Design a protein with these regions (language model features):
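C-terminal and inter-domain tail/linker signature
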Residues: 1-133
Length: 133
């Protein structure tokens, strides 16, 4: 039996491998994606669009990952190690700046074993300071 911890671990392994296809295979068609800045995204298509945008603008690896799971819910704490590759609309100009900041996420897994919610938090002001805003 695959556990919530196994599913979330596989999701973040796919993230670190840059394998968006594997990430998408682990999320439900009706996934809800919340980030601490901006509006929630509903559905796999918008989640895929967000990931394509992020891959274009940023290269990130998550380290020091700790995953806590209970039932169908999980939390993850990690360090985001990134490079700002292409200017993201409304943000400072990108020129290869690197950043390192703590982040966290809350996830839930449905009865089919697919992630149906990803809520991610990080400190945007810390990121802006690190990229020279």
């Amino acid at each position: 039996m695959t556990t919530t911890r196994d599913i979330v671990t596989a999701y973040y392994a796919a993230f670190n491998a840059g394998d968006t296809g594997a990430m998408l295979a682990l999320v439900a068609d009706d996934v809800r994606h919340d980030v601490n800045q901006g509006e929630p995204r509903h559905g796999k298509a918008l989640f895929a669009e967000f990931n394509a945008h992020m891959t274009h603008c940023y290269r990130e690896q998550l380290t020091d990952m700790v995953i806590f799971a209970e039932g169908q819910r999980a939390a993850a704490e990690f360090i985001v190690n990134g490079t700002y590759l292409a200017t993201d609309e409304g943000l400072p100009e990108a020129n290869g700046q690197t950043y390192r900041l703590p982040g966290g996420a809350f996830l839930s897994v449905n009865d089919a074993g697919l992630i149906d919610r990803v809520t991610t938090y990080y400190n945007l002001q810390d990121w802006l300071r690190q990229v020279g805003a």
